[in-house]
Amino acid sequence: MTDQSHQCVIIGISGASASGKSLISSTLYRELRDQVGDQHIGVISEDSYYKDQSHLTMEERVKTNYDHPSSMDHSLLLKHLQMLKAGQAIEVPQYSYVEHTRKQETVHIELKKVIILEGILLLTDARLRDEMNFSIFVDTPLDICLLRRMRRDVNERGRSMDSVMEQYQKTVRPMFLQFIEPSKQYADIIVPRGGKNRIAIDILKAKISQFFE
């Protein structure tokens, strides 16, 4: 029989890059943390599980298609989700967008009652879907996502506007159409208008709050 005290609820939040996933995730985390305490809820980003590329040259690293499922170490993420469900702590890798590889340090996460898992490719992997208690797809128009991504990558990740636009045209948009948008069919809840949809956030909060009862 499974120990009820060790059950960890996994909530997946997916959608296009810069669709508002992180905003919804952080809003849900912050507001629920204030209700139940940070010892009961945590957030994990799929971005932390980009594959280690320390064995590659910088020239090779920058050619990586970060919007293709093959760029992700989903096997490690799956292992970590299963460990959390078994009541074990995990060490979440950290990724450098400047060096295009994993950092040396990790982030220690203890068992939580609820883990919010967010990322663009989560719903493309059936193994990850099987670990989720329910999933959300943030459905935001691509032109809005592009503007947000340009602002974010230039200001926060040291990218040039030209490089962001080139990546969007070569990989981001094609990979969204090939992998991410089709994965929307697996979501239990679809949230339009991104992270500022307050009604949707309140509905999600009510749903997640049930797991703390």
Swiss-Prot record:
Annotated residues that bind ATP are located at 15-22
Which compartments is it annotated to reside in?
Cytoplasm
The record lists the catalysed reaction(s) as:
uridine + ATP = UMP + ADP + H(+); cytidine + ATP = CMP + ADP + H(+)
Q: Which GO terms describe its biological process?
A: CTP salvage; UMP salvage
* Residue ranges that the Swiss-Prot or TrEMBL entry lists as coiled coil: none
For this UniProt record, the keywords arranged alphabetically read as follows: ATP-binding, Cytoplasm, Kinase, Nucleotide-binding, Transferase
What is the name of this protein?
Answer: Uridine kinase
Say if the entry is tagged with keyword Nucleotide-binding: yes
Main localization category: cytoplasm
